[in-house]
Amino acid sequence: MGRVSTAFVPALALSFVALVSVTARAQNPGGSPEGKKMKNPVASSPESIKAGQAAFQKNCRFCHGADAKGNGPMAPEGTHPSNLTDDKWDRGSTDGEIFLVIQNGAGPKFDMKGYKSKMTDNEIWNVVNYLRSVQAK
């Protein structure tokens, strides 16, 4: 029995490290070197934020919720869409990284499809501006 317990400890430690890594990744979906270099070409303005909110309500609310808190009624079973109003979720994510996640999706683990075929680049940048406007300060 002592051997099993001794062999179990490294496996448990490895599992813990994997869990911490996955959790850290979930808190920062970006991490794209390309995204870190991108600059938002759309100035944040009341017009951009309003357009971004409209695009968000049309495309994103079903999973992320009308209030962007991750409580949408149509999220795939077993998934937990991000609370996009939580500044902790956004920590470390640049506008470019958020843009790329919206454009290309986050998956397969996070099960978010990309919207490049449904939204123009300008619409996506407006959504980024909207999300910045609703994040906790």
Predicted regions and their residues:
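Positively charged n-region of N-terminal signal peptides that target proteins for export
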Residues: 1-6
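Bacterial N-terminal signal peptides
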Residues: 10-19
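Sec/Tat signal peptide C-region and signal peptidase I cleavage site
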Residues: 20-26
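Axial heme c-ligation environment in periplasmic c-type cytochrome domains
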Residues: 26, 76-83, 103-134
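Electrostatic cytochrome c docking/interface patches
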Residues: 28-55
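Gly/Gly-Pro-rich "capping" loops immediately C-terminal to redox-active cysteine motifs
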Residues: 42-49, 69-97
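Sequence/structural segment immediately N-terminal to covalent heme-attachment motifs in c-type
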Residues: 45-69, 98-100, 104
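Inter-heme linker and motif-flanking segments adjacent to c-type heme-binding CXXCH motifs
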Residues: 69-70, 133-137
